[in-house]
Amino acid sequence: MVIKNHSSFFLMVLTIPFIFLLMGCPGQGDRLQLDETTQVKLIGDNICFHITNARNYQPAIISINLRGTSPKKQEFIDNPSLRIRSEQLCIPPSFYQFTDNEKYIVEFVLTSLGSAAEPRKFVVGVGLDHGQVYGFPLTDREILRPYGSIEVPE
């Protein structure tokens, strides 16, 4: 009996440290970054997104696709010729021509120039109806957010 108690204690003492070795400790890159969303509006002919706390962030990549486009067919533009000015990221018609009566999913990643700040990823639902721009709620398949934070009918 004494041997049995010592062997189970010995096994437990060895198991706990090895679990940490196998799993590793969570580091900065292990944290899940949730997507942000923002308001969309028409300024002149440009479709603009309000970026709070823009500081020195600028777009590193952008994707504009019709809602429902499969991930394999989505198109991305690296280092787009767009800039954030006055906390607005604006897309002129010369960059992308939005079609009336369509819904788009616009995704973009902002990186901080000259700073080690974390990149920020935005996902925005953009609709166009008879020349009027509006934002629409996204489903959990379209945006990464805390589980159950917003109920959206699909």
Labelled PLM ranges:
Residues 50-52, 56-154:
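Acidic, low-complexity Ser/Thr/Gly/Pro-rich repeat segments typical of extracellular/periplasmic
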